[in-house]
């Protein structure tokens, strides 16, 4: 197994051969050596790796020396991976490798290993194609080396069985044999043996992994302990070294990088070190617990946190590394596959059978338990990510992706290490218990791991093959094949030679055709790498199979013993597995054990079958354990087995056959063997089916990891095991063909199986060649790659399940491709010749890859579009899909087993369907992926349909596969274009990734909304709780006082009665007093803190008093029982003393309580008064701020522009909205108390009836009493910053134009509708605003401004501004801005929710003060009281009373000019301001808006605007108080509307211009809302609103030009003081203005206009006289002053036929 592993390690720079990889990196020139050389070098590397593992165990610094070779690695990655691997293998591995092995702690075994390697060389010469066998042996070697290094580690590795030393010894023997097998392949095998053992040491050496990773990060102890485990641990160790070698890391990294680069190109090199480091950490933790399995699992998880998880045990660990390595390095992939296998076999390697099972189980357990369910998901995500990146890297994705994934994997690994730390202690139990159970948790991780493993097996293993001279794309694809080979290798390592057999056949076929492959691969790097990886993987698998046979013969006994122990540990699952092949979870472990035990002979009989069974033993024991435990472990085993079976039909077949043989032997009782054997002819399809089943099973396992109990046969592990069992059944079906061959003629089985495999491969190859589906299989890989890229583009699709499905799909497709290719290769390799098979496979793979790439590209595009369109549907259908998927999963599981029994194609179809179902299920878990998976099933079907189609597809595919199982088992499944073996899940990969990305975005948005809503609700609840707590605290305090008094009375009475009792009572009282003091002292400090803080103390005090009462009563009773003696003993003096003490204590406690209570009440009242004051001050300040804002927001003034723009944007909305719409948004604009009231009510004080509002305000005052202090402080700050606040609120954004600052009620309604605030009823729309306001209030209370920012949508301005606003801003009413931003930004980018602040604010401040009065009024009762008359006009606002009538609040805060117009404009203000501020907030304007403007828009605008802007008061006012005014205004507006409705037009006429000019006499800076109010006959849109605003801008321009002209004239005339400037009716200036604005003297110019003109003229005079006119924007200050002078426009201007009436 190590041979394949080592090969992949060489190719991928696996951890075991990391040093070798570094050496390889140094040896890119040796690329010529390519695969054959690479294999011998692998053997050497394996030897060296074993040494390195030992040395890694002892030194991790050598890998850093390899790290020096990291830079060569990139070049080699691009260069001939083979040569690089070979060079590294032969050269660097020998040097660094042995050094690394020395580190690994296999030092003791180095000699043995070298001997074994030489033996292996001999065998390798015979079984060069079976390097995987040697790898398996190496795994044992690793155990042996580990045993030599540290028996305790070895034991931990052999966790599954006490045979760890036995495994180590056997491993040594087997490793020796394997090494010889490796050697038999030449130095390649020996090298692989070394690498294998090193990798095994790393993978198995949990301690070693810990040694490498933990050695530096964790502990040398784990290293020493795991050192024995560290043969396989050495593999993990190298993995660890890659990641964690401070010194070893560089080496391991370089090594891994080289390999990974060689294989994945330079991408994995960087990633792999990170991944490897991750492994180190995880491995460190894991190695102790898993004893190599978990260490391997942890190590692999950490080294390829994703890679390891992807391997899910043997497969899981293998897979993630395959994923990360598959992307970037054969080292990773090899480590992935070998370490996966090693991880699987590591433990298995320790005891190939039980060790593999336990290793896989431990891996799965380590993954599941180390990382936990969520951690497993995270790992799965990381692994999926890494796999994506690995495959993307193989497809030419940047290394950064792999690096990112590896970094994520490292992070996960780091956390995994922590988890592994705990798992280290539990890994043995986990290994045994979680072989099945932990596998379920691991399944979730391994599932994605397994998926990754499956994907990476083809990907990583092919990458392992292709990495030697592969480009990233090819590497990725080859990575898929290679991963399968690696998976097979992992299965071989994990289960013994069978995967290696597959690997061997792959490697053998690939070795001869590797160079030819390279020439073809040069033409198509992707196909070339993939095919090369497949072929090399097959060679490795074949060699490994052969070596593993020898090693397995030796290991088999150990594995049998250990797996028997492991199966005993997993007896329930394993026995069930044996009993039920259908219960893959159960069957898996025992099948693995049984297969390892019983099928070792068969497996041995047939090198590949033997290899496959051992992988099943290991992969199935370990991988199946993993599979059952990790879904990917078993999947890894099955994917490894199946993928290996498909990869090298020989190795795959053997592997599958062995898996099936194992499963059959286990399932033989079930009769699946015979059934499996029945479809021997379609064994290739069966293999594909098995692979599909494995993929589907993996997905099922992954799904079962998510819902491992979906089928929960006996337990999560049972369900997983059942899934695995089904996988086993699938494998058995596939393998049963081989198994029949194997079993029927174990020696002959290989050839009959090969014949069947060959037939299948030929059929599949022909199908792949002929059908675009074969191309699509590869195209699916490419598509998957593309999807992976998209996922990378959308990293948010990191949900484990998403990755599980995506990885499963990728692995499925990649594994299916590589397995199919491998099947062809293995069949052709075994039957025809590896080269012929390789050529054929390469041809088919290249063609199919090209086809699949093109077809999948088109499909991916289509699917992406479909997914994009489905994203919403997916989110809706996900739940259904998940349910369906669960059902379908269960069905496919059963169907898979049944169909597997029926025929291999049903297995494929069942698995194919299962995988889509799983994918759907996973996709459901991965919202984005769920759609894609169904989409591949039926690109045009919705998720629900996809899930349904998944079920239908299952049956259809089953029937189709049944009918055409030999031809295109999967052709009929999802997309006909996809390859026969292309799993439906894979088909959905692209869509899944896209859908996952889209769904993730949608999901995140939903989550954000949910979070906002939840935050708002929480805030409301918190406020309510605070109130309740305050009440409770008060009650508790009262009770406490009462209790104290009662207790004191009791004590006094008792003291009189009992003398001694009095002493006791004194003590008790003292205690009570202390408690009371504590309670009182705590309440006192708490008095200054929120009531909730006090509540616990008071409650505690009350409880304490109650307890004291009970205790005192009991003690009193006891004392009373002793009354006679006590009384007699007590003297009067004592009693008096007691009484004095009690009195003093009582007095003190009572006084303290009274003081505390009084202080608290006083404090609260002060707070309330402060709140009221702050509310009033805030209202006043808000009015001032609004005035200032209006001035500042004068469109010419930056602030005005800023404020106006803020209306448009969430940030601008803060202040301009605060000024303009904040009044409507009183809750936010309101003072903290009012805001709290609104927030508390959630309906908003404005939305609530006045009583409710008052109650809420009262509660809010209580709640915000403290807030009020803060808010008053902040208000003071804001008061200081009032003007700045407007600027701050609206970061200076140039108001594009007045139009931009104008927002129509319709716009408001649109915005509100978009924000969900639009509902015509103010309540619903106001709820968001109220929530926002409440949030702001809570932020004020809790200073949770960020929540408000996120929830309120005003995060831009609110976070920084809301603190001041929420407190001071409450008075200032900047708080409301957050709601406005949604409104404003949503509706009009240019239109500001707040009308042009400068234009609108003047009105808002005075006539339109309702805007900021509502803000202030909402929070300010005084302002509301001041504006009660406006409240009459604007009854809809109690707090809006202020807003409705700015004069009161504005009267106090604003100029009298502003307030006087208010009485006149109240109705006008409300129509205008409410319409403007509320966008229909005013009843009359709302009515007009309803009738004239957009009835719904206006209503919703008015309501929503009222809600948002009024703080929901307007809506209530509309509903309640507004009805009164609405009746009045509606009568007016109804009239207007009657005339307006027919006149309702969006065209502005000269009449409107004349009307606007006349309006200029009252308002120079009208807001768009005001303009809309007074042009009810205009259906406002962005254009005409802008036009109106522009008119007023022109009016102002003319006005100011005249002002400046006459001011300069006055200066020239020598006027000394501005007071000398007087404007009379006959003044030239007045005449000019009147002529311009009132040409026909339609109306009498209001007196106030003369005052405004005079003031303006004087301001200009002052500025010119003072020389300020030299300044750039000297007029802005004047504009601000003038903007405050706007007066309410007479109501008759609202008449549509105003001018007609005038004329």
Swiss-Prot record:
Keywords from the UniProt entry: Cytoplasm, Developmental protein, DNA-binding, Homeobox, Nucleus, Phosphoprotein, Transcription, Transcription regulation
Residue spans of biased composition, Polar residues class: 66-79, 437-452, 503-521, 608-617, 1208-1217, 1349-1367
Biased amino acid composition, Pro residues: 1374-1384
Keyword Zinc-finger among record annotations: no
Main location, first listed in the record: nucleus
An annotated GO cellular component: nucleus
Compositional bias segments (type: Basic and acidic residues): 110-126, 643-658, 674-691, 1040-1054
Phenotype reported upon loss of the gene: Embryonic lethal, results in the aberrant expression of the homeobox genes ftz, eve and en in a subset of neuroblasts, and in axonal outgrowth and pathfinding defects in both motoneurons and sensory neurons.
Biased composition (Basic residues): 1427-1437
Composition bias type Acidic residues, residue spans: 127-136, 875-892
Alphabetical list of Gene3D superfamilies matching this protein: Homeo-prospero domain
Phosphoserine modifications at: 479, 482, 485, 497, 651, 654
Motif (Nuclear localization signal): 1291-1298
Matches recorded under SUPFAM superfamilies: beta-sandwich domain of Sec23/24, Homeodomain-like
Comp. bias (Low complexity): 36-53, 92-109, 137-188, 196-255, 274-292, 327-337, 346-357, 453-472, 618-642, 927-944, 1055-1076, 1252-1278, 1328-1348, 1438-1451
Site for Interaction with DNA, residues: 1582, 1587, 1590-1591, 1594, 1597, 1676
Entry similarity comment: Belongs to the Prospero homeodomain family.
PANTHER family, A to Z: HOMEOBOX PROTEIN PROSPERO, HOMEOBOX PROTEIN PROSPERO/PROX-1/CEH-26
Known function: Homeodomain protein that controls neuronal identity. As a transcriptional factor, regulates the expression of ftz, eve and en in a subset of neuroblast progeny and modulates the transcriptional activity of other homeodomain proteins such as Dfd. Required for proper neuronal differentiation, axonal outgrowth and pathfinding of most or all neurons and their precursors in central and peripheral nervous systems. Regulates asymmetric stem cell self-renewal together with brat.
Domain notes: The Prospero-type homeodomain and the adjacent Prospero domain act as a single structural unit, the Homeo-Prospero domain.
UniProt-recorded name of the protein: Homeobox protein prospero
Species whose genome carries this gene: Drosophila melanogaster (Fruit fly)
């Amino acid at each position: 197994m190590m041979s394949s592993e080592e090969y992949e390690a060489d190719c991928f720079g696996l951890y075991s051969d990391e040093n070798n990889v570094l050496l390889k990196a140094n040896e890119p020139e040796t690329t010529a050596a390519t695969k054959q050389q690479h294999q011998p070098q692998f053997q050497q590397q394996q030897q060296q790796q074993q040494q390195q593992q030992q040395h890694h165990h002892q030194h991790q610094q050598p890998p850093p020396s390899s790290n020096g070779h990291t830079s060569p690695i990139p070049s080699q990655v691009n260069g001939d991976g083979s040569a690089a691997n070979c060079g590294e293998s032969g050269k660097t591995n020998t040097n660094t490798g042995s050094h690394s092995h020395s580190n690994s702690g296999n030092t003791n075994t180095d000699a043995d290993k070298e001997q074994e390697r030489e033996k292996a060389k001999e065998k390798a010469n015979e079984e060069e194609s079976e390097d995987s066998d040697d790898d398996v042996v190496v795994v044992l070697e690793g155990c042996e080396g580990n045993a030599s290094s540290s028996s305790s580690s070895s034991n931990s590795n052999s966790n599954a069985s006490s045979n760890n030393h036995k495994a180590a010894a056997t491993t040594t023997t087997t490793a020796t044999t394997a090494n010889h097998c490796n050697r038999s392949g030449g130095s390649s095998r020996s090298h692989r043996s070394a690498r294998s053992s090193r990798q095994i040491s790393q993978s198995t050496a949990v301690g070693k992994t810990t040694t490498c990773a933990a050695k530096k990060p964790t502990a040398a102890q784990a290293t020493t302990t795991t050192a024995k485990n560290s043969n396989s641990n050495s593999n993990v160790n190298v993995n660890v070294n890659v990641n964690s070698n401070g010194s070893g890391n560089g080496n391991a990294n370089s090594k891994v990088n080289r390999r990974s680069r060689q294989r994945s190109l330079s991408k994995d090199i960087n990633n792999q070190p990170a991944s490897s480091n991750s492994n180190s950490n995880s491995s460190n933790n894991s190695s102790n617990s898993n004893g190599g399995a978990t260490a391997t699992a942890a190590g692999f998880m950490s080294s390829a946190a994703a890679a390891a998880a992807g391997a899910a045990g043997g497969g899981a660990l293998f897979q993630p590394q395959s994923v990360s390595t598959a992307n970037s390095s054969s080292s990773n992939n090899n480590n992935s596959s070998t370490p996966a296998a090693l991880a699987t076999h590591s433990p298995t390697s320790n005891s190939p059978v039980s060790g593999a099972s336990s290793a896989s189980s431990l891996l799965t357990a380590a993954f599941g338990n180390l990382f936990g369910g969520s951690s497993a998901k995270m790992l799965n995500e990381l692994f999926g990510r890494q796999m994506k990146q690995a495959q993307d890297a193989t497809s030419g994705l940047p290394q950064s992706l792999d690096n990112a994934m590896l970094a994520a994997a490292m992070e996960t690994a780091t956390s995994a290490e922590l988890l592994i730390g705990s798992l280290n202690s539990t890994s043995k139990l986990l290994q045994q218990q979680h072989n099945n159970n932990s596998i379920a948790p691991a399944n979730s991780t391994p599932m994605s791991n397994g998926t990754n493993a499956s994907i990476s097996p083809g990907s990583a293993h092919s990458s392992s093959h292709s990495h030697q001279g592969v480009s990233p794309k090819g590497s990725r694809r080859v990575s898929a094949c290679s991963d399968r080979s690696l998976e097979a290798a992992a299965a071989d390592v994990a289960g013994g030679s069978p995967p290696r057999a597959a690997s061997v056949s792959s490697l053998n076929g690939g070795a001869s055709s590797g160079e030819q492959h390279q020439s073809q691969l040069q033409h198509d790097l992707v196909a070339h790498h993939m095919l090369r990886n497949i072929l090399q993987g097959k060679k490795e698998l074949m060699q490994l199979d052969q070596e593993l046979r020898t090693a397995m013969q030796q290991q088999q006994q150990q594995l049998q013993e250990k797996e028997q122990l492991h199966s005993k540990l997993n007896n329930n699952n394993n026995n069930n597995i044996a009993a039920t092949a259908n219960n893959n979870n159960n069957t898996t472990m025992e099948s693995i054990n049984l297969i390892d035990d019983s099928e070792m002979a068969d497996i041995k009989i047939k090198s590949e079958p033997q290899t496959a069974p051992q992988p099943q033993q290991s992969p199935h024991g370990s991988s199946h354990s993993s599979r059952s435990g990790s879904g990917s472990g078993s999947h890894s085993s099955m994917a490894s087995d199946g993928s290996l079976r498909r990869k090298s039909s020989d190795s795959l077949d053997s592997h599958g056959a062995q898996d099936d043989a194992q499963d059959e032997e286990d399932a033989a009782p079930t009769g699946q063997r015979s059934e499996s054997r029945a479809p021997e002819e379609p064994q290739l399809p069966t293999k594909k089916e098995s692979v599909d089943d494995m993929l589907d099973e993996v997905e099922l396992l992954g799904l079962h990891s998510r819902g491992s109990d979906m089928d929960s046969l006996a337990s999560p592990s049972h369900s997983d095991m059942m899934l695995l069992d089904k996988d086993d059944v699938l494998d058995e079906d596939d393998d049963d063909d081989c198994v029949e061959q194997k079993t029927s003629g174990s020696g002959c089985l290989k050839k009959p199986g090969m014949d069947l495999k060959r037939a299948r491969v030929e059929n599949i190859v022909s199908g792949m060649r002929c059908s675009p589906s074969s191309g699509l299989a590869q195209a699916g890989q490419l598509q998957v790659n593309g999807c992976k890229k998209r996922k990378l583009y959308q990293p948010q699709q990191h949900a484990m399940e998403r990755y599980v499905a995506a990885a499963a799909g990728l692995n499925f497709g990649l594994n299916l491709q590589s397995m199919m290719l491998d099947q062809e290769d293995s069949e052709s390799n075994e039957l025809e010749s590896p080269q012929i098979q390789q050529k054929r496979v390469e041809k088919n793979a290249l063609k199919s890859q090209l086809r699949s790439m093109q077809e999948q590209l088109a499909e991916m595009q289509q699917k992406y579009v479909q997914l994009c369109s489905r994203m919403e549907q997916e989110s809706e259908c996900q739940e259904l899909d998940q349910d369906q998927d669960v059902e379908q999963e269960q069905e496919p599981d059963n169907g898979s087993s049944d169909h597997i029994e029926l025929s291999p194609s049903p297995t494929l179809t069942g698995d194919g369907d299962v995988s889509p179902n799983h994918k759907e299920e996973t996709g459901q878990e991965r919202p984005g992926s769920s759609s894609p998976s169904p989409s591949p099933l039926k690109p045009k079907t919705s998720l629900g349909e996809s899930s349904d189609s998944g079920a239908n597809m299952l049956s259809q595919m089953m029937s189709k596969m049944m009918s055409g199982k030999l031809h295109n088992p999967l052709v009929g499944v999802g997309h006909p274009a996809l390859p026969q073996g292309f799993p439906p899940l894979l088909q959905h990969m692209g869509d899944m990734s896209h859908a996952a990305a889209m769904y993730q975005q949608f999901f995140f948005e939903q989550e954000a909304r949910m979070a906002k809503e939840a935050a708002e609700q929480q805030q409301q609840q918190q406020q309510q709780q605070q109130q309740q707590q305050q009440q409770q605290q008060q009650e508790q305090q009262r009770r406490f006082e009462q209790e104290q008094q009662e207790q004191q009375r009791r004590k006094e009475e008792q003291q009189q009665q009992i003398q001694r009792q009095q002493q006791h009572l004194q003590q008790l009282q003292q205690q009570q007093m202390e408690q009371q003091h504590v309670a009182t002292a705590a309440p006192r400090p708490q008095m200054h803190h929120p009531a909730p803080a006090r509540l616990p103390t008071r409650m505690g005090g009350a409880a304490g008093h109650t307890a004291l009462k009970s205790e005192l009563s009991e003690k009193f009773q006891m004392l009373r029982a002793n009354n006679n003696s006590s009384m007699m003993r007590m003297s009067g003096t004592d009693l008096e003393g007691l009484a004095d003490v009690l009195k003093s204590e009582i007095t003190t406690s009572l006084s303290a309580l009274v003081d505390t209570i009084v202080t608290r009440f006083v404090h609260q009242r002060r707070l309330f008064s402060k709140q009221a004051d702050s509310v009033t001050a805030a209202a006043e300040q808000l009015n001032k701020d609004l005035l200032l804002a209006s001035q500042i927001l004068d469109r010419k003034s930056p602030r005005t522009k800023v404020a106006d723009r803020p209306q448009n944007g969430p940030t601008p909305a803060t202040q301009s909205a605060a000024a303009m719409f904040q009044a409507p948004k009183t809750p936010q604009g309101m003072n903290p108390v009012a805001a709290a009231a609104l927030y508390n009510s959630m309906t908003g004080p404005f939305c609530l009836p006045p009583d409710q509002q008052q109650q809420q305000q009262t509660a809010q005052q209580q709640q915000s009493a403290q807030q009020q202090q803060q808010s008053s402080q902040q208000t003071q700050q804001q008061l200081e910053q009032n003007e700045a606040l407007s600027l701050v609120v609206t970061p200076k954004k140039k108001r594009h134009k007045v139009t931009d600052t104008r927002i129509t009620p319709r716009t408001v309604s649109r915005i509100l509708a978009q924000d969900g605030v639009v509902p015509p009823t103010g309540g619903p729309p106001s709820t968001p605003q109220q929530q926002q306001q409440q949030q702001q209030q809570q932020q004020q209370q809790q200073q949770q401004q960020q929540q408000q920012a996120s929830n309120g949508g005003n995060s831009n301005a609110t976070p920084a501004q809301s603190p001041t606003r929420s407190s001071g801003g409450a008075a200032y009413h900047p708080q409301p801005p957050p709601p406005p931003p949604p409104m404003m930004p949503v509706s009009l980018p240019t239109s500001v929710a707040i009308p042009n602040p400068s234009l609108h604010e003047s009105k808002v401040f005075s006539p339109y003060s309702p805007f900021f009065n509502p803000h202030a009024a909402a929070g300010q009762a005084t302002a509301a009281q001041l504006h009660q008359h406006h409240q009459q006009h604007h009854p809809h606002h109690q707090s809006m009373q202020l807003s409705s009538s700015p004069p009161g609040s504005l009267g106090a805060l604003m100029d009298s000019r502003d307030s006087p117009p208010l009485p006149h404009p109240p109705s006008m203000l409300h129509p205008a301001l409410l319409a403007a501020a509320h966008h229909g907030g005013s009843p009359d304007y709302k009515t007009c808006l309803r009738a004239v403007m957009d009835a719904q828009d206006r209503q919703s605008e008015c309501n929503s605007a009222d809600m948002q802007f009024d703080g929901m008061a307007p809506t209530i006012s509309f509903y309640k108080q507004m009805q009164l005014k609405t009746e009045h205004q509606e009568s007016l507006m109804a009239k207007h509307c009657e005339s307006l409705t027919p006149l309702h037009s969006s065209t502005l006429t000269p009449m409107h211009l004349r009307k606007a000019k006349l309006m200029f006499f009252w308002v120079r800076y009208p807001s768009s809302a005001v303009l809309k109010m007074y042009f009810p006959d205009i259906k406002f849109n962005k254009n005409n609103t802008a036009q109106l605003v522009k008119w007023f801008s022109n009016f102002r321009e003319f006005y100011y030009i005249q002002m400046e002209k006459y001011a300069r004239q006055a200066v020239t005339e020598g006027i000394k003081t501005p007071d000398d400037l007087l404007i009379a009716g006959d003044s030239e200036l007045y005449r000019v203005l009147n002529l311009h604005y009132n040409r026909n003297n339609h109306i009498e110019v209001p007196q106030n206009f003369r005052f405004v003109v005079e003031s303006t003229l004087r301001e200009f005079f002052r500025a010119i006289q003072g020389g300020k006119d030299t300044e750039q924007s000297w007029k802005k200050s004047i504009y601000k002053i003038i903007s405050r002078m706007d007066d309410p426009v007479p109501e008759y201007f609202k008449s549509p036929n105003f001018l007609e009436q005038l004329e």
